[in-house]
Every structure is written in C-alpha cells, then in structure tokens.
C-alpha cells in the first residue's frame, strides 16, 4: 500500500492562493484549505445558517505528496520562495508540519473539506464527486479541487464571479488571464459568453483548467492555452478578467486596453489593500474608468470600463 505525506502550512488568510499554487508547483498532488471563515455567515440550500465559529486570521493549507517526494526539500524551497515575497504580502508567521497517511486516508482526507457552495445569486460550485441537484435558476460549476488551485471559494474568486454576473449579458468574447482552475471561464460560459479564451503561464494550470472544463457539459466555447498574460494575443474582447497578484496585473493593463472593445470591461482581482491605489492609478492612466470597486477583508476587486465613467463601491 502506498503511503502519502501530508504537509500542513499555516499562513495568514491573504496567502491562501499564493501558498496553494506554490505547493502545486512543488509537486503536490492535491491541496485542501481549512478556513474558519468558510463557515461564518454561510447559508445552506434550506436557509439554515451555520453556527458562528471562532474567526481566525490564519488558514491552513494542506498539501499531499507521494512518499517518493522529499518533503523536507519542499519545505525548504517553499520557505525560500515565500521569503522573496515578504515585501509584497504579509503572510504572518508561516508554520509547517508533516505527517504520513495511508493511501485510503489520502483518497478521502482532502475531500472532507469541500462541500457545494453557493457563491453568487446564480452560481454554485460543486465538487466533481458530489451528486447535487440544482434548484430552479441555479447554475452549477463542477470542479475537481483535488487537482489544484482550491475550490473557487476564495474572496478574490467570489468577487470575480460577482463582477462577471454584473457585466455579462450574452454573446460576449471573454479573455480569462491566469485561468488557474478555469472556474471564471466556466462561469463566463454559463452566464452567456459566446467565446472564452483562457490563458495561464503554468502548464499545470492549463491542464487542470482543461480537465475542469471537461467536467461541465456544453463548454466547447472555452479555449485554453499556455500564455504569458496577454503577450502575443490579438483577440478583441468584450470582457477581460484576471484574478492574479497586483504586481502582475499592472503588466497586462496596457495590453488589456488595446484588446478590449469600446464599452468593454476589464475585471481585476487578487489585489491586496496596500496595492489597490497602484492598480487603480495604472488602469486610469491607460484610459480606463472605474465602474465598480468591491472589497472583502484585505482583498479588492474592480471593474473598469473603457469609455464610461461610473463609480461605485461595494464593500464586503
């Protein structure tokens, strides 16, 4: 029987996506997130509110590695990568610990963290192994979070989905930059976009996105490819969406302005509070006008329009 290794990394909530993606890059076969906030204010399908639980500033990212992987080296490499990023993000005191578990435990252990989650008015994310019956008007996104990139319930993803609901009316061309799990592309298709082109620099993300897309019927209008932001892209779009770190976002803004159609939208998420002014000023300097600004905790998401200036703030 094969033995797996479970590496737990405790970090501030803001570091969830960053640490998850780094662990995948370092060979993890699956990642699970433990976050007390997942239960706070959550409402199930019958209107029952889950009991309040103690809200922690920290979350636990659990990564699973085969016994053949030297997890001590993974820990060392992760510490080194995180040390390079301390100027960009406050990760708090990073703590790590490793335990061994049998294959049957690995097969089920990470699944216990994932349940169907109603993310927006219309969209519900459902783990691929769950038998879930949609209610009237409910749109289902099937994901396999065991492969990589979490379940799509991170605040930056949630706000991106809200923004897509806000701007998509049907028939649009969408560019999804840094697609990760592919959740934003799948949502765009469900919300009526005609064509979606999804890009990611990471070959693992390209594969995972394609696999998640195939879990959802009728997604033939989504095209996934490896790409470095919008470099070399010549597709005009009605909507461009990017949920990546702020220091990377600013490098795609000029290309986004070139590619987005008049009256089109640029949705940007993954912006921590300290980087918001930098991103806003960069977008406005390129010619965009801020239409909507959403805030949840330390995270910011924004909707910019190419020609129209309507400002609004939604706080969360």
From Swiss-Prot:
EC number of this enzyme: 2.1.1.-
Short name of any one Pfam family annotated for the protein: PrmA
N-terminal signal peptide: none
Record-listed S-adenosyl-L-methionine binding positions: 157, 178, 200, 243
Major localization class: cytoplasm
Sequence similarity: Belongs to the methyltransferase superfamily. PrmA family.
Record-given protein name: Ribosomal protein L11 methyltransferase
Gene: prmA
């Amino acid at each position: 029987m094969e033995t797996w290794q479970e590496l737990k990394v405790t970090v501030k909530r803001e570091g969830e996506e960053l640490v998850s993606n780094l662990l995948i890059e370092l060979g993890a076969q699956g990642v699970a997130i433990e976050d007390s906030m997942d239960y706070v204010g959550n409402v199930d399908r019958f209107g029952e509110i889950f009991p309040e639980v103690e809200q922690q500033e920290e979350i636990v990212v659990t990564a699973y590695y085969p016994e053949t992987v030297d997890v001590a080296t993974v820990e060392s490499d992760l510490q080194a990568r995180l040390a390079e990023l301390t100027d960009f993000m406050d990760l708090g005191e990073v703590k790590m610990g490793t335990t061994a578990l049998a294959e049957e435990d690995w097969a089920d252990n990470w699944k216990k963290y994932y349940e169907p989650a109603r993310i927006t008015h219309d969209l519900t994310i459902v783990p691929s192994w769950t038998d879930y019956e949609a209610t009237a008007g409910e749109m289902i996104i099937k994901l396999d979070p065991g492969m990589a990139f979490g379940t799509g319930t991170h605040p930056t993803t949630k706000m991106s989905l809200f923004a897509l609901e806000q701007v998509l009316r049907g028939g649009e061309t969408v560019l999804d930059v840094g697609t990760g799990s592919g959740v934003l592309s799948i949502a765009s298709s469900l919300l009526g976009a005609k064509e979606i082109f999804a890009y990611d620099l990471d070959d693992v993300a390209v594969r995972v996105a394609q696999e998640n897309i195939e879990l959802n019927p009728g997604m033939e209008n989504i095209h996934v490819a490896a790409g470095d932001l919008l470099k070399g892209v010549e597709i005009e779009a009605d909507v461009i969406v990017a949920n990546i770190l702020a220091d990377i976002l600013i490098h795609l803004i000029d290309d986004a302005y070139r590619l987005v159609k008049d009256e089109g939208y640029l949705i940007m998420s993954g912006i921590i509070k300290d980087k918001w002014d930098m991103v806003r000023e960069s977008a406005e300097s390129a010619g965009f006008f801020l239409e909507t600004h959403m805030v949840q905790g330390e995270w910011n998401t924004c909707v910019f329009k190419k020609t129209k200036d309507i400002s609004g703030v939604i706080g969360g």
